[in-house]
Each structure stands twice: as C-alpha cells, then as structure tokens.
Regions:
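C-terminal helix-rich "cap/oligomerization" subdomain common to oxidoreductases
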Residues: 1-6, 84, 334-383
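Short, Asp-centered acidic motifs that coordinate Mg2+ and/or phosphate
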Residues: 38, 82, 162
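C-terminal glycine/acidic-rich active-site capping loop/insertion
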Residues: 138, 182, 186, 215, ...
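Predominantly a Rossmann-like dinucleotide-binding segment in NAD(P)-dependent oxidoreductases
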Residues: 139-233, 287, 377
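Glycine-rich, aromatic-lined ligand/substrate-binding cores of catalytic
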Residues: 203-285
C-alpha cells in the first residue's frame, strides 16, 4: 500500500482567458495537495501551446486532443490521478467517458452532459471502475451553505414546508428580441443549442438552485411545472418553475439572465414550521436565520459560534470575505481527499462532502423535465 501525499492532475479546456478554468486551478492550488502536470487546454494549437508554456507543462504532456491525453496518461507510471474538465457543455460526456474508461478519476463542470442516458452511463462506469467523479456545483462549497444544511438537518427550523429561491443575472439582456447577438465567447456558445444543449438559463444557473436546495434540505424534485422565455433566441433566458418534492412539499424557483441590475443574484430561502434560513450568494459570509416569534439572527462566517462543517472549511478570519475560489476549494478538498485514499489503496466507503456524478445526473433530469414542461403547456412533468 502506497502513502502518497500529493496528487497529479490534468486539465481539458481552460486555456488562458477562459474564466472557469482559472477558477479551478486557483482552487486546487489553495488545497496544496495536487500539481498540474498534463493538459489539452484548447483545440486551437496556438492557444494550447501558449497556455501550456504559461503553466510550465512539459511538451510531451501537452496534448493535441483529450483522446491522446487519456490514453497516454493512463499508460504512464507517473500519470495523472484525476482530470478536470472545463470545456463547453457539448463535450463533457465524451471527455469524461474517455478518462473514466482509462481508469482516471474525473472532476467535471456542470451540467454533466446533454442527455439522461449519457449521465447514467457515466455514473455506471464510475461505479464499476471504482472511480471518484465530482461535478462542480459551486454553491454547496460555501461555508454558510454548509451551516444552513446542518441547521435544517438538526431541525432548527422545524419541518420544511416551503422553498423559494431565485438566481437572477442581467448579462444577456442585450439578446432580448434575438437581433442583438453579442460576440463574447461565453454568450455565443451559451446561446447555441449545439454547444449548450436543450437549455441555456436553466442548464447554466437554474440547475444550481436545484442542487443547492437538495444539498441543504435533502429534498429532490418529483415533478415540475415550468414556463421558459426565449425572447427570440434559440434557448431560454428566463424561467419560472413550480416544484413538487418527493415528500409533497412545494417550492418556487426563478432564474433569469435578463434582469437588469442583478449581477449574480442567487438567493436560497428555506421555510420551516418553526423558522427559516436564507443565504444570498452576493453576501456569502452571512446566513440569516429566523425563528418564529423571534428577531432575525445573522450568522457570520469564521466566528466562534459557527461550528461543524462550516467551521472546518473556513479558510480566513471573519471580516475578510471568502468567495467563489474558496467554495471551489472546499469541493476539491472532499474530492481530492477521496482520490488520495484511492491511490493509496483505501477506497472510501462513502464519498466526502462534495457533489458527485449522481448529483450531476439529477441535474440533467431536472433540466429535461423543466424544458419538457414548458413545451407542453407548462403541465406537471415528472423529473
């Protein structure tokens, strides 16, 4: 049995200038337990080479394709332990499958893939090959979301009776009407069905609501009734969704990328028979807790009265805001901890505190149910 202390990882996608690839690299670096040693950063040769040189990837481990990378790295004695997939949605499935079949652990951006069948296949391969598979639903990584989960699980707000959550942005507002297509790299592929899949807004941000609510409450949608607005574009830019959970509780999700004045307005509100919890992403270090008949309480990250997972994954002192990169680091803390156990011959009986391929499959099912509901007169649709 080996006793490795550090991991080796590779990346597909995430060339210089790409937003999310840089976030993943910084988050992994914060954990100080893994080194980037191989990559296929871009299908464009010049961009791939430029990024490889910047991150000091040796030439023989800078690959022209993910297929070549998976094959070569799996054959090396010092090959990568896991791969990070930060490509556009359309290639998640094929890239993840190639590395799973090569026996390499996977971390993949959401949404997991295009179809439910693809997601279930990836889940099966990972299970059969005993491989770890993280899907980076960011917001479950925030310390105060973890506190909300612990309070709800402990019954501090009583029985959950209602959920009301929103995720509002305005970065696609110029697309309304379909005649003003912006030319930023992200907006072009996000609004293209060939690259983004059957949904833009729900697939990009609505699925974050579904996953974060499920993480905090343990409740999963049973059926949905949804209205999607395309505003002249090929894919949705606005969605309003009624949700019925498996336990009969109902909720409302609203997500939009055309709400002027809202930059990244994710708000999760869980209402119980004895109180409520509310977390707002743009003020991530705070959690509002209200008990019926009592004044509101505001919990601050990093303080002595915050314990459990929220304290364990606290990086810097209170008053110094933590944000997106730290949330990703918390996800990688759990994922890389499990990968390290695997490479040392200790397969974990239970995965750590991070979203897995099963959460990714749940997200794909949610997206399909929402889109199908909207296409069918907003009727109730099974998830």
């Amino acid at each position: 049995m080996s006793d490795r202390k550090r991991l080796r990882y590779g990346m597909v996608g995430g060339g210089l200038g790409a937003f999310i690839g840089a976030v993943h690299r910084r988050a992994i670096a914060l954990e100080e337990t893994a080194d980037l040693v191989a990559a296929c950063f871009s299908s464009r040769e010049e961009k791939n080479k430029e990024t490889g040189e910047f991150y000091r990837i040796t030439p023989e481990r800078l690959y022209d394709s993910y297929e070549e990378m998976a094959k070569a790295e799996s054959a090396r004695e010092d090959g990568i332990d896991f791969v990070v997939i930060v490509t556009p949605n359309a290639t998640h499935y094929e890239v993840a499958k190639a590395f799973l079949e090569a026996g390499i652990h996977v971390s993949c951006e959401k949404p997991l893939c295009f179809t439910i069948e693809q997601g279930e296949e990836l889940e099966r391969i990972a299970r059969e090959k005993h491989l770890m598979f993280a899907v980076t639903y960011t917001y479950t990584g925030y310390a105060m979301v973890k506190l909300a989960k612990e309070l709800v699980e402990a019954g501090e707000i009583g029985k959950v009776v209602n959920v009301n959550s929103e995720y509002l942005q305005d970065w696609l507002i110029d697309e309304i009407g379909g005649g003003n297509q912006t030319t930023t790299k992200m907006s072009v592929w996000r609004t293209d069905p060939a690259k983004s899949g059957i949904s833009n807004c729900v697939g990009d941000i609505g699925t974050h609501i579904e996953d974060t609510v499920a993480y905090i409450t343990g409740m999963h949608p049973k059926k949905v009734a949804a209205v999607l607005d395309n505003y002249g574009m090929d894919l949705d830019m606005n969605a309003n969704i009624l949700v019925e959970y498996e336990n009969g509780v109902h909720g409302v999700y609203s997500c939009s990328q055309v709400c002027a004045g809202h930059l990244n307005g994710l708000a999760i509100r869980i209402f119980g028979s004895e109180g409520s919890v509310e977390w707002v992403q743009e003020e991530p270090d705070y959690l509002k807790v209200t008990k019926k008949g009592q004044p509101d309480q505001i919990y601050h990250r990093g303080t002595g009265y915050v314990t459990g997972m929220a304290a364990d994954r606290n990086h810097i002192p209170s008053g110094h805001p933590e944000g997106l990169t730290f949330a990703f680091a918390n996800i990688y803390h759990g994922f890389m901890g499990d990968v390290l156990k695997c490479v040392n011959g200790q397969y974990p009986e239970k995965t750590g505190d991070y979203p897995t391929v099963s959460d990714g499959v749940a997200g794909v099912k949610f997206i399909h149910a929402v889109v199908n509901s909207s296409k069918n007169a907003s009727g109730w649709t099974e998830v």
